[in-house]
């Protein structure tokens, strides 16, 4: 029978519930337990697909085309398991489903209420994940903070869950903050006590406390938390701040998180195999060099807007024993001050996805600079479209060339709306979303990076390269190195003769893993290391000449 772990958070938001859930998933998987992780988000949006990146951060796309919370990216990267639309649930999607059932007469004329109709729908979504893949353990993260009014239906649903499936089949895990007060020079447990009190008032007694803190939690403090929160002292887990999220599984493993969880669920306490993960962390902590890569975007004020891109660069760096230092460049600043001011000392330039015209000219200038200065370049989604615009304007000399998204009146729409998007009215969930096949052309950079001829990548876009300009693109030196299997959609372009210049319509960042970096990111970081080494050698030669 599938077991269930529910992860709640208290005291403050952004406490790290997603990383705790993902870390527990990693630890259970290292013991050969199968795991699926579910996120319950309390906002009323049906999904985050139409939300501003500044408010929500990255929209993570699953293989089956769901637009989900960025925590699903953590789940996939830590457990190396692909999630689906079943693993992301919002208040909006719950209410939408219940209202649709009411309209169909499914409730036989009854009064539709939060209890039992909303809570039953929430429980059904959790059971659906268990039925779909039949994992040993389903870990469910409840978004928000205990005490928020928005989370109450979810908390009531998980309270009922233990009664429904049996006491020994459910663990309640509460992630909380133990702050250090500089003036008093001590850590304080009172916020956690009040958070647990709030949780108890709903009817949930936590079985495990995961305590976020910036220094070790002393045994006396654990005993105090145990006494006041009615949690066994061995189930009070220290989750001390780490330099990298990939250290967290090892930290909580030493604290006995997985061991306590398995004991509470009456599961066999198997020995973990964390050798690969320990090696990964060790390589991260002892890089041979540091390279600087510029990320030229329009949402750079919030790094979470590009979370999977950032993590994919980290993965590539680990593989080549390098620390990737990110230079966050606002594309609008390039429009104002020029590309050289921000990009002259970097070893690689990455232009990620995005929507809307703001900052596009700055991205185009950054790509031109990468092309002319022979700096390794990787473009993703909008990054590829901007690379096409840069080609059209500066190489093909096509008058007022642009994307139809940014200038519907352009005489040269080198990027155009996908035909199937022409009659689409709604914004949410209507793009080209999810996993699609791409056929690679032989003897290209793309084919040298990937081990197979046909690849499968995740997409999120409405616009595509306009095939009316494909012949001209090729005639002027570019290569179309990846297309849809029918040859219609251009998926990858590259520039021969350049150290590394490649751009994709898809989002490779969604499939990178810490122990298995995505081929494009690995190739890009390797090229950046080569560029760094070349520049370093040239600088040393210049110094010798001066001497």
Curated annotation (Swiss-Prot):
The keyword NAD does not apply. Its EC number is 6.3.4.2. CTP binds at residues 13, 148-150, 188-193, 224. Pathway: Pyrimidine metabolism; CTP biosynthesis via de novo pathway; CTP from UDP: step 2/2. Residues 292-534 form the Glutamine amidotransferase type-1 domain. Coiled coil: none annotated. UTP binds at residues 13, 188-193, 224. SUPFAM superfamilies: Class I glutamine amidotransferase-like, P-loop containing nucleoside triphosphate hydrolases. Pfam families: CTP_synth_N, GATase. The active site is at 381 (nucleophile), 507, 509. It comes from the Bacteria. One of its GO terms (molecular function) is ATP binding. Residues 1-267 are annotated as: Amidoligase domain. It is an enzyme of class 6 (ligase). Homotetramer. HAMAP family: PyrG. CTPSs have evolved a hybrid strategy for distinguishing between UTP and CTP. The overlapping regions of the product feedback inhibitory and substrate sites recognize a common feature in both compounds, the triphosphate moiety. To differentiate isosteric substrate and product pyrimidine rings, an additional pocket far from the expected kinase/ligase catalytic site, specifically recognizes the cytosine and ribose portions of the product inhibitor. This is CTP synthase. It comes from Rippkaea orientalis (strain PCC 8801 / RF-1). The lineage of its organism: Bacteria, Bacillati, Cyanobacteriota, Cyanophyceae, Oscillatoriophycideae. The gene is pyrG.
């Amino acid at each position: 029978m599938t077991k269930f772990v529910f992860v709640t958070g208290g005291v403050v938001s952004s406490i790290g519930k997603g990383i705790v859930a993902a870390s527990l998933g990693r630890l259970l998987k290292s013991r050969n337990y199968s795991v699926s992780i579910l996120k319950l988000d309390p906002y009323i949006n049906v999904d985050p697909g139409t939300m501003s990146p500044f408010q929500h951060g990255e929209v993570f796309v699953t293989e089956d085309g769901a637009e989900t919370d960025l925590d699903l990216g953590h789940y996939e990267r830590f457990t190396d398991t692909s999630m689906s639309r079943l693993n992301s649930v919002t208040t909006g999607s719950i209410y939408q489903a219940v209202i649709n059932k009411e309209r169909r007469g499914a409730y036989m004329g009854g009064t539709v209420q939060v209890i039992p109709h909303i809570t039953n729908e929430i429980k059904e979504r959790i059971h659906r994940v268990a039925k779909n893949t039949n994992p040993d353990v389903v870990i469910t993260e409840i978004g928000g903070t205990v005490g928020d009014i928005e989370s109450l239906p979810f908390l009531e649903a998980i309270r009922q869950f233990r009664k429904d499936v049996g006491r020994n089949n459910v663990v309640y895990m509460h992630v909380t903050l133990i702050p250090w007060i500089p003036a008093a020079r001590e850590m304080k447990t009172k916020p956690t006590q009040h958070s647990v009190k709030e949780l108890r008032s709903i009817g949930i007694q936590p079985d495990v406390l995961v305590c976020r803190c910036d220094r070790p939690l002393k045994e006396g403090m654990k005993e105090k938390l145990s006494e006041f929160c009615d949690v066994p002292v061995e189930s009070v887990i220290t989750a001390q701040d780490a330099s990298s999220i990939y250290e967290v599984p090892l930290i909580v493993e030493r604290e006995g998180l997985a061991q306590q969880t398995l004991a509470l669920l009456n599961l066999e306490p198997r020995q973990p195999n964390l050798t690969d993960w320990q090696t990964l962390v060790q390589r991260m902590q002892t890089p041979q060099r540091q390279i600087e890569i510029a990320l030229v975007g329009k949402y750079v004020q919030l790094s979470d807007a590009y979370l999977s891109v950032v993590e994919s660069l980290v993965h590539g760096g680990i593989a080549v024993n390098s620390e990737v230092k990110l230079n966050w460049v606002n594309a609008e600043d390039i429009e104002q001050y020029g590309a050289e001011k921000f990009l002259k000392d970097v070893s690689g330039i990455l232009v990620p996805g995005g929507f809307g015209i703001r900052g596009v000219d700055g991205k185009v200038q950054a790509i031109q600079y990468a092309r002319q200065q022979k700096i390794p370049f990787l473009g993703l989604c909008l990054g590829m479209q901007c690379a096409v615009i840069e080609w059209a304007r500066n190489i093909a000399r096509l008058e007022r060339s642009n994307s139809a998204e940014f200038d519907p009146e352009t005489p040269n729409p080198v990027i155009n709306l996908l035909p199937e998007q022409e009659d689409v009215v709604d914004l949410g969930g209507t793009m080209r979303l999810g996993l699609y096949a791409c056929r690679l052309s032989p003897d290209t950079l793309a084919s040298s990076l990937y081990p197979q001829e046909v690849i499968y990548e995740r997409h999120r876009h409405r616009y595509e390269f306009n095939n009316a300009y494909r012949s001209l693109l090729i005639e002027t030196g570019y290569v179309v190195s990846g297309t849809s299997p029918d040859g219609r959609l251009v998926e990858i372009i590259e520039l021969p003769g350049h150290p590394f210049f490649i751009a994709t319509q898809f989002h490779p960042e969604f499939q990178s893993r810490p122990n298995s970096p995505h081929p494009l990111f690995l190739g890009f970081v390797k090229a950046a290391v080569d560029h760094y080494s070349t520049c370093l050698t040239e600088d040393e030669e210049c110094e010798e000449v001066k001497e």
